[in-house]
């Protein structure tokens, strides 16, 4: 009897695990793990030096594999005397807000998502005059493409890794009109709940 129960359990697990994990409705939440900036600051041979990233990714997938999401996160810059570092007193970071549309590809076993997004980037800092970075820099527009791969742990829950490639070349210095290129990439991790 134990062998039959074990065999049925194993067969059911394999069957459920190997079927596509499309859901009628899915909610996903994630966090950024790291950001790299490959673009250059205006007039420099280097870009801003990212340090710690915090924020969130939220997404809702509809029954026909199409979904919508938002990203909101801030990456603090390194401080000190190295290239790309900012003054410690300014506590400067790059604030990113994106709105996304994505599609889940019909791939068995894993949840594979591709998407596009658009939004803004801006410097977030403290200044000695108390006005903050918005008094000295204009917000810039940003676009991204991204992909996410998720592995279902149980039929109603999966864990996923994501990669975002961001183009953000136009945070403008209000004083001299130069633009900073903060293009780069962001990696993240998240969980999805399927209903």
How would you label these PLM feature ranges?
Residues 23-39:
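Short N-terminal segments immediately surrounding and downstream of signal-peptide cleavage
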Residues 34-56, 135-139, 169-171, 181:
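Surface-exposed strand-loop-strand hairpins of Gram-negative outer-membrane beta-barrel proteins
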Residues 11-12:
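Repetitive helical segments and hydrophobic/amphipathic motifs
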Residues 1-8:
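Bacterial N-terminal signal peptides that target proteins for export
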Residues 156-195:
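Hydrophobic secondary-structure block in the mid-to-C-terminal portion of proteins
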Residues 40-43, 84-86, 129-133, 174:
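Extracytoplasmic loops and strand-loop junctions of Gram-negative outer membrane beta-barrel proteins
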Residues 31, 35, 56-131, 138-141, ...:
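Gram-negative (and chloroplast) outer-membrane scaffold detector with strong preference
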